[in-house]
A protein has these predicted regions:
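Beta-propeller blade termini and top-face loops
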Residues: 1-223
């Protein structure tokens, strides 16, 4: 904000709450004062926030509103209450028999997956193929930083857990990359890119025979 016509400015809202700056969700789209008052309303990718004291503090007006936009969703094969969902601009959310939709990783929630055998082993991601892993049922996630050789994927980079074998996961860039040790290391399933310089949009591993992988790139389907 500025209190002298724009000559000087002070940050009064920050996504990460830098220092003593109060939290306001990122990606702002609109701001407006309530007529005849000092109440300022700000519209963001995380909903509506309000200040009544010139930005010294903000109120989140979105509590209790069960709304968001999910990019991707996955479910445990053994426990249907275990669900992961990646929400645009609002992180990745986990639901289970003991957790009622908790945000487990932040940023832009993208693709995700739960291990075929071990429900404590789960994965989330953010944009361009930045993946995270939890080994304790979503209590803590750490970055999987072993995929740097694959380059940059799509904004929503596709990801799948193997439908049969534990610790086995796949990620789609220009090639399909596979890990058999829960993301500890990766290898490409092919020597060449599937379709030139085009990234993979989506792919699925057949549960009847995991050697069969169907890949979608632009308007084409590859197997």
């Amino acid at each position: 904000k500025s209190t002298n016509g724009g000559t000087n400015w002070t940050c009064v809202g920050h996504w990460y709450g830098a220092g003593s700056t109060p939290y306001v969700h990122a990606d702002h789209h609109h701001a407006d004062f309530r007529p005849g008052t000092s109440e300022l309303y700000v519209g963001t990718d995380g909903g509506v926030y309000k200040t009544t004291n010139s930005g010294s503090s903000w109120s989140d007006l979105n509590d209790g509103m069960n709304i968001t936009q999910y990019y991707k969703i996955s479910q445990s094969t053994s426990d249907t209450t275990v669900i992961l969902a990646g929400a645009q601009d609002n992180g990745s959310h986990l639901r289970s028999s003991t957790i009622n939709w908790s945000e487990v990783t932040g940023g832009d929630g993208m693709d995700n997956g739960v291990d075929a055998v071990n429900d404590n082993l789960m994965y989330t991601s953010v944009y361009y193929g930045d993946f995270y892993k939890s080994t304790n049922g979503g209590g803590f996630f750490s970055s999987i930083n072993t995929l740097s050789v694959s380059g940059s994927g799509n904004w929503v980079t596709p990801f799948n857990t193997d439908p049969v074998t534990t610790n086995t996961v796949y990620a789609g860039f220009k090639k399909i990359w596979k890990s058999t040790n829960a993301g500890g290391s990766w290898s490409a399933t092919s020597s060449n890119n599937i379709s030139g310089n085009s990234n993979i949009d989506e792919f699925e591993v057949a549960p009847s025979n995991t050697n069969y992988i169907y890949t979608l790139i632009n308007s084409n389907i590859y197997v």
